[in-house]
Amino acid sequence: VTDPHLDHLQPLHIDAFCRDVNAVEADVVLLGGDIAVARNIREILRMLDDAIAAPIHFVLGNHDYYGAGIDRTRARVAEFTRASRRPTWLPTAGVVQLTPDTALIGHGSWADGRFGDYERYDLMLNDYRLIDDFIRLDRPERLAKLNALGDEAAAYLRDVLEDAVRVSRRVILLTHVPPFMEACWHEGRISTPEFLPHFACKAVGDALVSVMR
């Protein structure tokens, strides 16, 4: 499941969502980010943990940081998951062994501005208005921040993927941001050069390819 944006729902509708998830009778549930926003991400994760039968493994998406800063949100989520039996926030878990042959790894990643044409198009996303780290940045500073966040995700995933392939024949990667532009689609086609800088992470794609070769 990805991008449920459960902060838009009333509790009874979140309960209905959880019932639908339980009806699948899955062995595990993977949440691919954009679960809520910063002010209620922990509350909603707690609701999901209470209501969903299967173990939950998740990453964060950009919307999960809305209304706060990246480091603060990550710290609060890490604190919550340390204190809970479940769910599992994958960037703090390393390699999760689902079966003897299958490993799970994950990181929300971040669009790094390297695909498409960042310089040509002055696109202002809500991310840059609603996440503290971006609010006061000009365009060059914003690109540098996107590069840094993408590089951080790539470094983590390169290391954890190397660990995973040493012990497992199959590796499942959960991420929020597409690591290849061919996987970044909008309205039935690959996103345009205007949008690609803000919706895909080249650094992560390069890291994955370098390990798997």
For the regions a protein language model found, what residue spans apply to each?
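N-terminal active-site segment of His-dependent metallophosphoesterases
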Residues: 1-58, 65-73, 133-143
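Active-site neighborhood of phospho(di)ester-bond hydrolases with catalytic His/Asp-centered motifs
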Residues: 1-2, 29-34, 57-62, 88-93, ...
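Active-site environment of divalent metal-dependent phosphoester hydrolases
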Residues: 6-9, 36-42, 63-74, 94-98, ...
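Short amphipathic alpha-helices and their capping/turn segments at secondary-structure boundaries
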Residues: 18-21, 46, 89, 95-101, ...
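Conserved beta-sheet core of the metallophosphoesterase superfamily
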Residues: 49-50, 55-58, 101, 179-213
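Glycine/small-residue-rich loop that forms an oxyanion/phosphate-binding "nest" at active or ligand-binding sites
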Residues: 69-91
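A structural motif corresponding to the C-terminal end of an alpha-helix
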Residues: 83-87, 159-170, 206-213
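Active-site-proximal loop/helix segment associated with metal-binding centers of metalloenzymes
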Residues: 105-172, 177-195
